[in-house]
UniProtKB/Swiss-Prot annotation:
Keywords: Cell wall, Cell wall biogenesis/degradation, Disulfide bond, Glycoprotein, Membrane, Secreted, Signal. This is Expansin-B4. Induction: By gibberellin (GA3) and wounding. May cause loosening and extension of plant cell walls by disrupting non-covalent bonding between cellulose microfibrils and matrix glucans. No enzymatic activity has been found. May be required for rapid internodal elongation in deepwater rice during submergence. Belongs to the expansin family. Expansin B subfamily. It is a peripheral membrane protein. PANTHER family: EXPANSIN-B3 (PTHR31692), EXPANSIN-B4 (PTHR31692:SF9). One of its GO terms (cellular component) is extracellular region. Residues 75-181 form the Expansin-like EG45 domain. Transmembrane segments: none annotated. It comes from Oryza sativa subsp. japonica. Its main location: secreted. Residues 1-24 form the signal peptide. Residues 194-281 form the Expansin-like CBD domain.
Amino acid sequence: MGSLSSLAAAAVFLSLLAVGHCAAADFNATDADADFAGNGVDFNSSDAAVYWGPWTKARATWYGQPNGAGPDDNGGACGFKHTNQYPFMSMTSCGNQPLFKDGKGCGSCYKIRCTKDQSCSGRSETVIITDMNYYPVAPFHFDLSGTAFGRLAKPGLNDKLRHSGIIDIEFTRVPCEFPGLKIGFHVEEYSNPVYFAVLVEYEDGDGDVVQVDLMESKTAHGPPTGRWTPMRESWGSIWRLDTNHRLQAPFSIRIRNESGKTLVANNVIPANWRPNTFYRSFVQYS
């Protein structure tokens, strides 16, 4: 059975390679370093998310279709799907390492604004990290969807701002809000009795997940085992469990966010679960 698990993990890795990633941008690295000297903000320095901190300098680019959600498949390296629909509504962004955090920044929310370009409105907009871009454009780099980039413009100047290519912006982290939604779990393709992979999404507050654990049941209709098994981050916001035995559902799933807050979705994955299926919980961060 171990071979099934290995093949599934390999398939997931290949699917990551197929994901449409953010595009490279032309820039002057020396100018970027000079412009951002003294920024003095390290978003990896704390174990807890900090909201509404000082506005911090960054640079923004955009990719995909002018009015799109970024990748042509409306996905991204975080594993989120249908980012052109509610609650993402195409207001998405790739993040560089301090924002994407090797996947642990997936789902986090930021207010961004631009003021220097003549086409900028100066109005702040909220974007969600759904993808990665590690091109060294700036210490903090948002590679926005065409939709999000255009929303920073004055009325009627969306295309003109997009033609600027690279712009200076400011950003601050904010709590995510997904009205009407509970935390969701999408069982990924290739999951099987010895390999279980799940996408976690729609977390209010931090928006991200730093640890996921799974609890099996004793039988299909029996009580839970009472034992939590840590899952491993597969990529983005997808977590997996490889085992040497057949997993017994229903599964309860425990998640912990960046601020250390824990939630448990009891029996959220039913005994008759199927791959490529979404299961909504009854829990949400307050």
